[in-house]
Amino acid sequence: MSSLKDKSSASAAERQERMAAALAADPGHKTWSWRGIQTILITLCVCCCSEDAGLDGAVMSGINAMKQYQSYFGMSESGAQTGIVFGIYTIGGLIGSFPAAYLPDRFGRRAPMFFGNLVLIVGAVLSATATHRGTFIGGRLLTGIGMGCANTSAKSYLAEIVPPQTRGFWVGLFNSLYYIGQMSATGMMVATGRWTGNQLAWRLPLYIQAVPAGINVLFVYLCPESPRWLYANGRKDEARAVLAKLHSGTNDHYSPVVEIEMEEIEEKTSLDGADKRFWDIRSLIRTASDRYRTGSAVMVGIFGQLSGNGMVTYFLPVLLGQAGITSQDKKLTLTFVNSVTSMVGALIGSAVIDRLGRRALLLGSTTMLICILGIIIGLLSSDGNSRQANAGIAFSKWRVLITSVLF
């Protein structure tokens, strides 16, 4: 097993050296050239999928704290019905992951984004116009299905379309746009939450959730198809043309950068069975290095969920109430501050990841996160101490910042 891992590591190191030499010969487009701007626009269109996910978490967290929403549906901040409303979205995301496994290989990477965001728009409108709790929950289910389908494909598409030398930054930016959506929603709800007696206070944010999805639906088919999908479906010349247009500074179809990327695509496609058998997971566990990478990816996903970030996002107003903050306006304001802190952390992470490396950033951020969580536990361990509670809330912002850098 160790020999296989060593061989894989040597091959990866050799490939990195070849890529570094290729990038020295052809560094790609400048950021503000037309092709560079085109890459930015493609990325922003794809990142609408991430922004929608951020909007949803923040919108539900915010409206769950609004008296207008609670009285209309007869809900409480943390009752069983509230758990169903939050949980049904997660179930929808799980359902949406199944078409996300099939559609990208059958119809291309853009199709699941288009389909998923259409479903999301229907779900958002259904939730925003709901007059019964069941209708509202149904809208939440559709929103989750759309999100699960679109978001999964968006990440793989982005990693396959952006230049290799800035891939870490762009994928990090994808995660950062989650917090842009979160910040937009929480900032808006600070204002709408003050509309006493007006049902638009909670309905308007749900409508706004459909905006990024609508942008993606309108423009995603103006973006080029993934070169990996084109190659896997016998359209090798088109795959080379896309790589040359976006990754070569001279639009050279036989640039050393393009040649290396075509070799990588050919190698993975031949190993994975033409990239078409979505049910075949043997490529994930075929060799020791494959199992090592798969295990690492699974563990990062588990750690991301167990960090508590999702739970804190949804139930932050409840946690603030337990810390002694009862004002609806102050809860919404602190939720907005939480979103700003998250965005700052995500931007820092995306900016430094290509310089510090994935592993160093992961281990360093995890260590700091453990220390800060320990401090928060100590500060919030005593009931009735307002000073300790306020200090705990302050340190929780640092926890959010570091979690955003990490994940």
Regions found by a protein language model. Give the residues of each.
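Short intracellular "coupling" helices and adjacent cytoplasmic loop segments at the cytosolic face
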Residues: 246-260
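Cytosol/matrix-facing amphipathic helices and coiled-coil assembly/linker segments
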Residues: 257-274
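Alpha-helical transmembrane bundle of multi-pass membrane proteins
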Residues: 1-247, 270-407
